[in-house]
Amino acid sequence: MNFVTTLTYLLPHRMLSSLARHVAYCQHPLIKQWLIDTVIAKFDVNLSEAAEPDAHAYPSFNAFFTRSLKAGIRPPDPNPDTLLMPADGRISQLGPIREGRIFQAKGQSFTATELLGDTAAASAFTNGLFATVYLSPRDYHRVHMPCTGQLLKTVHVPGRLFSVGPDAVRQIPRLFARNERLVCHFDTTFGPMVLVMVGALLVSGVETVWGGVEIPAYGDRITYKDYQGRNIAIERFAEMARFNYGSTVIVLLPPNVLTLAPHLTAESPVTLGQALAHRLSLNHSTQAPTQEK
């Protein structure tokens, strides 16, 4: 473990993330513009794709970071039997959920039960599929539905706020099962589906279209919210949530229904709306991507 990763264990995660939240919403013109210009320069942000391409038009850093895209800039795969990529970013890992375990990096894994905070819920994904998508600071930070789904429940799992950058993922054991996260359960035509919004260092919040700000949700207990009977349906490709800074979304899919798109591998750059998986009846190859051991 290198010095930087070791340091992340010692940092006051909550204090830093709280400070980041206040700064992100600051509307002082000098402060917000310095932050916006710094991020654009450091991470090579492409504002030509944004609905508002003028970097000076955003009232706060958070408004810039959660910016919308131009209409039609990310056309979704038109095949209704294709599950869509939920976000812009880069594949961290993807593949089968073997013996209830989700691969994180070479020599690192965690259980679906740890991730979801619920043994019964995790059992629905035994021998299913997962995909972990990392959103860097340069990416579009809204998460969209891979397919039409009915919201069943959410689970807020408190935890740490480690960085979720590539170095941290390789070196911090069970990272995604230790960080604070919001687990969103849906019923879909493909069966049960879970989207996990993972918090991280300096992430000032996670918002959903149905509940507003879900993280931070201070406390040390797992919190369940039941949405059955409230008829909250979100259409395929519609926005379902957004990060107020870069982080990670993990998709869990049931067994024997879908096969992951064969061109996807770890570290693949991905865009919102491209194919993530195909229904097995489409006669695609069922071979899962190879993972490092």
Curated annotation (Swiss-Prot):
The active site is at D88 (charge relay system), H144 (charge relay system), S247 (charge relay system), S247 (schiff-base intermediate with substrate). It is found in: Cell membrane. It comes from the Bacteria. InterPro entries: PS_Dcarbxylase, PSD-B, PSD_type1_pro. The modification Pyruvic acid (Ser) is found at S247. It catalyses: a 1,2-diacyl-sn-glycero-3-phospho-L-serine + H(+) = a 1,2-diacyl-sn-glycero-3-phosphoethanolamine + CO2. Is synthesized initially as an inactive proenzyme. Formation of the active enzyme involves a self-maturation process in which the active site pyruvoyl group is generated from an internal serine residue via an autocatalytic post-translational modification. Two non-identical subunits are generated from the proenzyme in this reaction, and the pyruvate is formed at the N-terminus of the alpha chain, which is derived from the carboxyl end of the proenzyme. The keyword Lyase applies. Pfam families: PS_Dcarbxylase. This is Phosphatidylserine decarboxylase proenzyme. It comes from Xylella fastidiosa (strain Temecula1 / ATCC 700964).
